[in-house]
Amino acid sequence: MWKDLFTKKKKYASIPSEKVRSEVPEGIMTKCPKCKKIMYTKELVKNLRVCMSCGYHHTMPSRERINSLLDEGSFHEYDADMVSVNPLQFPGYIEKLEEDRRKSNLNEAVITGEGTLNGYPIVIAVMDSAFRMGSMGSVVGEKITRAIEKARELHVPFLIFTASGGARMQEGVLSLMQMAKTSAALKLFSDEGGLIISVMTHPTTGGVSASFASLGDYNFAEPGALIGFAGRRVIQQTVREELPEDFQTAEFLLKHGQLDAVIHRHDLKDTLTTVLDIHQGGGGHGWWQS
């Protein structure tokens, strides 16, 4: 009996091999990809989605950006119901569009409209990478072109925020045509004295970077934004040279004269207001030359 007491094996509770799932609901917390700090999403949104620890600029949804810049209640959206079709009958394209509409609560990769920024009337276009990675298809090109034409009609500045992976491959050459179409609209607008302000956000690449994104009278960018046409690996294999670590970043482009300024998101509204102040002149729409 005494022998059994001392030789009896201890029993241990078994631990499940599966990872214990977090009880924190999805969306409550956000992890910064740069410094790895975990923060409340609500606090991050209040800080314009700029990391409170390292200053990393997280992706900002288009409607949040519009609300952060324009005067309250001043925004009127254009072409909200315009949606893409499948002109080339590309397999699975319609299903992907429907999935993105459901997930992003957007109809397309750009929102356009008019409003006032600290009292200045403007036409604005804001791209959103949550929808098809902000890719430019026929509808994106059409909405941006119509917005430019509206700014031309109203004699007000045109402000665009870009965030895109480039042309939308599912629409083939129809997508590539939007590069020429939007650029031509900007040329007409500029020739008549219209003010164009472009703000490139992460990422601005492909056909978007090679067309309307780079055609502003002022070309600004947010810190750390990836900006370029072809991918880093493609360029490296073509030139057969090691590229700088900061290649295709906003800071690299600024250093080489391709940007006018890299602007922290917290300073963006004040900077845009200053630009409008300068071009406004003595009152009215002083930015319109003709």
UniProtKB/Swiss-Prot annotation:
Annotated function: Component of the acetyl coenzyme A carboxylase (ACC) complex. Biotin carboxylase (BC) catalyzes the carboxylation of biotin on its carrier protein (BCCP) and then the CO(2) group is transferred by the transcarboxylase to acetyl-CoA to form malonyl-CoA.
Keyword Lipid metabolism tagged: yes
Keywords for the protein's UniProt record, in alphabetical order: ATP-binding, Cytoplasm, Fatty acid biosynthesis, Fatty acid metabolism, Lipid biosynthesis, Lipid metabolism, Metal-binding, Nucleotide-binding, Transferase, Zinc, Zinc-finger
Record family assignment: Belongs to the AccD/PCCB family.
Zn finger region (C4-type): 32-54
GO-annotated cellular components: acetyl-CoA carboxylase complex
GO molecular function terms listed in the Swiss-Prot or TrEMBL record: acetyl-CoA carboxylase activity; ATP binding; carboxyl- or carbamoyltransferase activity; zinc ion binding
Subcellular location: Cytoplasm
Protein's name according to its UniProt entry: Acetyl-coenzyme A carboxylase carboxyl transferase subunit beta
UniProt lineage: Bacteria, Bacillati, Bacillota, Bacilli, Bacillales
Pathway(s) annotated for this protein in UniProt: Lipid metabolism; malonyl-CoA biosynthesis; malonyl-CoA from acetyl-CoA: step 1/1
Subunit structure: Acetyl-CoA carboxylase is a heterohexamer composed of biotin carboxyl carrier protein (AccB), biotin carboxylase (AccC) and two subunits each of ACCase subunit alpha (AccA) and ACCase subunit beta (AccD).
EC number(s) from the headed UniProt entry: 2.1.3.15
Main subcellular location: cytoplasm
Residues that hold Zn(2+) according to the record: 32, 35, 51, 54
Pfam families named in the record: Carboxyl_trans (PF01039), Zn_ribbon_ACC (PF17848)
